[in-house]
Structures are given as C-alpha cells and as structure tokens.
Amino acid sequence: MSFFRYLSDISSETRTLLLAYGVLGGLYLILVPLALYWWMNRRWYIMGKIERLFVYGLVFLFFPGLILLSPFLNMRLKGQGET
C-alpha cells in the first residue's frame, strides 16, 4: 500500500489536523529556535537587562528546538581575540 493511497483513505478532518500539528511542530522545533539563535547572536553584547530576561525565558520555552538545532549551528561568541 503506497503512502498516497493511505493518505487518500484518511478523512479530510484528520488530514487538516495532521497538517496543523505539522505546522505547529515545525514552528516550535525549527522556525522559532532559528529566529532565537539569530537574535541572540546579533544582540548578545548590547542587550539590556529586561531584553536578556525575555530572551532567557524564550530559551527556556523553546529549549527542545534549540537542542535539536545545536549540532548544526556554530554560534560561538566573539572572544577577546588573540592574546
């Protein structure tokens, strides 16, 4: 039985529900953590206290997605340069 035949046997409500779960899962596990990585990398040295607290809260909220993406991203902060 092919995948498309199996998919055609599923009701439209179930397909809509699966699509909604897929979109929300993609947002939670990939899209928002990527945006959070980008934001932290861009603003790390110029964040204020409130912004840093907000970003740490988002890191706590989207931790599973950040862990999934961490092996593929190298976001090391700038060091002191050569000593």
UniProtKB/Swiss-Prot annotation:
Name the GO cellular-component terms. organellar chromatophore thylakoid membrane; plastid
Do the record's keywords include Ribonucleoprotein? Answer: no
Q: Which domain of life is it from?
A: Eukaryota
Residues annotated as transmembrane = 17-37, 53-73
**What GO molecular function terms would the record report?**
oxidoreductase activity, acting on NAD(P)H, quinone or similar compound as acceptor; quinone binding
How would you describe this protein's topology in the membrane? Multi-pass membrane protein
Catalytic activity entry: a plastoquinone + NADH + (n+1) H(+)(in) = a plastoquinol + NAD(+) + n H(+)(out); a plastoquinone + NADPH + (n+1) H(+)(in) = a plastoquinol + NADP(+) + n H(+)(out)
Q: What InterPro entries is this protein classified in? A: NADH-quinone_OxRdatse_su_L
Enzyme superclass (EC) = translocase
| Keyword match Lipid metabolism | no
Keyword terms = Membrane, NAD, NADP, Organellar chromatophore, Plastid, Plastoquinone, Quinone, Thylakoid, Translocase, Transmembrane, Transmembrane helix
Which EC numbers characterise this protein's activity in its record?
Answer: 7.1.1.-
Q: Where in the cell is it found?
A: Plastid, Organellar chromatophore thylakoid membrane
**Into which family does the record put it?**
Belongs to the complex I NdhL subunit family.
**Tell me, how does this one assemble?**
NDH-1 can be composed of about 15 different subunits; different subcomplexes with different compositions have been identified which probably have different functions.
This chain's function reads: NDH-1 shuttles electrons from an unknown electron donor, via FMN and iron-sulfur (Fe-S) centers, to quinones in the respiratory and/or the photosynthetic chain. The immediate electron acceptor for the enzyme in this species is believed to be plastoquinone. Couples the redox reaction to proton translocation, and thus conserves the redox energy in a proton gradient.
**Record's protein name:** NAD(P)H-quinone oxidoreductase subunit L, organellar chromatophore
Q: Which organism is it from?
A: Paulinella chromatophora
Primary gene name = ndhL
